[in-house]
């Protein structure tokens, strides 16, 4: 705290005091309250509270009111407020003559570092503000060749010699300028959308810490956060809090791959040392609507894509259990060994939920590993209203759950949850002596890195943990319920309009709403190969116009023999009914002349 100069009366009354300490002690309530005003709100209130113990009620009220008024008058985002000695105040700085070598750890580099980072924060805050501003574009689209050739001083080529910090700041601005604002309320293109401010703060701090998740030794708090959060997620799935395991991975595709590795190790542990040649010819089962990562994992892990058997789905995209059992029996008759079934809770395109209870019955009957890919639908477990759609998930051996989708956590944040403790460790452990020494001074069971197939592992947990603390489980529940309500609103708005046609009948189970826009030229035209071919070209044309205008973004795709259709997904808590209305109007505007 800064020292205060006592008044003359105070000086006379302290004539016999120690001259080395007298001037360090403010002697009036006003002086002390001035000191309190320079502190954080929490500490300042404590100081004021201490002063009030022997003061009158009138004086107490005056002191606290003065402190609160002073605190509330401060601009919380002001750099002038961050340090009372002014080190973090913005000053005019000529960055054209400054380079990376002038920043910390350079000698006398603190001031330049502060000014540079304040400029970066200014860029970031402007971007955040514009992201939530509906009058701004979702994207400023340019073709690859335009960006590669350079845009108004924005050059992607790397140079041999250092460029000034002024140019680096320009590059920071332009990188955001020409990117896509995935947090914009009218961005509906992917399953991962939104820009959560608490999560953003967590990611800033994560990058600043710049640590690795392989041992407690170098990431003590993050390792404990991960264990606590994974335990909570397993409980929400419906497993015993004492059992189970899990780890955060780079994404749902890797989490799904972990599940196949765990299943293979559980039934055939010798594969770890002897390879696939030592085990029978194994087959995996997944639905024809499941995520392509199951086939990709089959290829990467040595099963081969021919041994990833696709199960038929009904018109809503759900696995037909009878076809699963038929294909299991067919595989056994051909000499294959069925190993693993993947059920999807929230398919990528239709948002369908496979009948997990019936699939679990079949897996138990034939002793197969059941995995539930709830990358997209796992968030619904947080909702008392919607979690019934994942009924039976507690019977799974493993679950993929991506908080970076429905829960709005910033990319990347995916978890693989395993019901049986020890399988991930046994499957992946290599006991690298330079990392996982058994004779450390702490409990080495907290060195979780050997469960992962990676060595270096990004800290994905902090932003998620911080968001959960800020929102609570109830906050996530409300957020998810709102997104599903918006999907119901969209469905109700277009289902009976002649310019739209639903891909399948019935209300959506998830926030996926799949539909065709029918231009005037195709309305009332009977179904035929020619009409389907023309309809197939409608969605891509509208999407191209949409991107050129930059007003909104929504995805499209074919499915089976169906022509290209729009797949609307809602996972951004910032979206409202007005944004849904805008999307419909924009599709009509862009498609009216097709």
Curated annotation (Swiss-Prot):
Tell me the segments the record calls region Disordered.
Answer: 1-23
EC main class here is lyase
| Family annotation (SUPFAM superfamilies) | PLP-dependent transferases
Q: What is its EC number?
A: 4.1.1.15
Answer whether the UniProt record assigns the keyword Manganese to this protein.
no
The cofactors it requires, by name, are: pyridoxal 5'-phosphate
Comp. bias regions, Low complexity: 1-13
Give the UniProt entry's GO cellular component terms: cytoplasm; presynaptic active zone
Q: Which UniProt keywords apply?
A: Decarboxylase, Lyase, Neurotransmitter biosynthesis, Phosphoprotein, Pyridoxal phosphate
Q: Which residues carry this modification: Phosphoserine?
A: 78
GO molecular function terms attached to this record: glutamate decarboxylase activity; identical protein binding; pyridoxal phosphate binding
Q: Name one Pfam family in it.
A: Pyridoxal_deC
The processes (GO biological process) annotated in the record are:
gamma-aminobutyric acid biosynthetic process; glutamate catabolic process
Known partners and oligomeric status: Homodimer.
Known role: Catalyzes the synthesis of the inhibitory neurotransmitter gamma-aminobutyric acid (GABA) with pyridoxal 5'-phosphate as cofactor.
Q: Which family does it belong to?
A: Belongs to the group II decarboxylase family.
Name assigned to this protein:
Glutamate decarboxylase 1
Which organism's genome codes for this protein? Bos taurus (Bovine)
């Amino acid at each position: 705290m800064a020292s205060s100069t006592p008044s003359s009366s105070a000086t006379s009354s302290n004539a016999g005091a120690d001259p080395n300490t007298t001037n360090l002690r403010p002697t009036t309530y006003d002086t002390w309250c001035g000191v309190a005003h320079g502190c954080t709100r929490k500490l300042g209130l404590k100081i004021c509270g201490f002063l009030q113990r022997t003061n009158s009620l009138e004086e107490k009220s005056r002191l606290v009111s003065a402190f609160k008024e002073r605190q509330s008058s401060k601009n919380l985002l002001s750099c002038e407020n961050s340090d009372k000695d002014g080190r973090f105040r913005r000053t005019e700085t000529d960055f054209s003559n400054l380079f990376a070598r002038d920043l910390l750890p350079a000698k006398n580099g603190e001031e330049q570092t502060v000014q540079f980072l304040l400029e970066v924060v200014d860029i970031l805050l402007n971007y955040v503000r514009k992201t939530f501003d509906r009058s701004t574009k979702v994207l400023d689209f340019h073709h690859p060749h335009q960006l590669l050739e350079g845009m108004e001083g924005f050059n992607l080529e790397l140079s041999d010699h250092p460029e000034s910090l002024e140019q680096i700041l320009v590059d920071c601005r332009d990188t955001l300028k020409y990117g896509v604002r995935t947090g914009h309320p009218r961005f509906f293109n992917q399953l991962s959308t939104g820009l959560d401010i608490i999560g953003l703060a967590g990611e800033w701090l994560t990058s600043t810490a710049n640590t690795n998740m392989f041992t407690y030794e170098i990431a003590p708090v993050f390792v404990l956060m991960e264990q606590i959060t994974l335990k909570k997620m397993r409980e929400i799935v419906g497993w015993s809090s004492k059992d189970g395991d899990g780890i955060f991975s780079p994404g749902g595709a890797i989490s799904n791959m972990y599940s196949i590795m765990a299943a293979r190790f559980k039934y055939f542990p010798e594969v770890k040392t002897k390879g696939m040649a030592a085990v029978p010819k194994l087959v995996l089962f997944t639905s024809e609507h499941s995520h392509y990562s199951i086939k990709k994992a089959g290829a990467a892990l040595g099963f081969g894509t021919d041994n990833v058997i696709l199960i038929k789905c009904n018109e809503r995209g759900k696995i037909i259990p009878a076809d699963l059992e038929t294909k299991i029996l067919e595989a056994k008759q051909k000499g294959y060994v069925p190993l693993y079934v993947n059920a999807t809770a929230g398919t990528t395109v239709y948002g369908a939920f496979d009948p997990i209870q019936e699939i679990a019955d079949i897996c138990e009957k034939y002793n197969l590993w059941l995995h539930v890919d709830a990358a997209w639908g796992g968030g619904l477990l947080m909702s008392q209203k919607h979690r019934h759609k994942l009924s039976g998930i507690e019977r799974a051996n493993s679950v993929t759950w991506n908080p970076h989708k429905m829960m709005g956590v910033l990319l990347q944040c995916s978890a693989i949850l395993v019901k049986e403790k020890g399988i991930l460790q046994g499957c992946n452990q290599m006991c690298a002596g330079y990392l996982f020494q058994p004779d450390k001074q702490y409990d080495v069971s907290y060195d979780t890195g050997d469960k992962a197939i990676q060595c270096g592992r990004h800290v994905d947990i902090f932003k998620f943990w911080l968001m959960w603390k800020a929102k609570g489980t109830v906050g996530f529940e409300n957020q998810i319920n709102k997104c599903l309500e918006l999907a119901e609103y969209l469905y109700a708005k277009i289902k009976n309009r002649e310019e739209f046609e639903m891909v399948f009948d019935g209300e959506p189970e998830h926030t996926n709403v799949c539909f065709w826009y029918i231009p005037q030229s195709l309305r009332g035209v009977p179904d035929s190969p020619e009409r389907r071919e023309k309809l197939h070209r409608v969605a891509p044309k509208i999407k191209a116009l949409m991107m050129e205008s930059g007003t909104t973004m929504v995805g499209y795709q074919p499915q089976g023999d169906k022509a290209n259709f729009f797949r609307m997904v809602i996972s951004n808590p910032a979206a409202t009914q007005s944004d849904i209305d805008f999307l419909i109007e924009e599709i009509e505007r862009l498609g009216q002349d097709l």
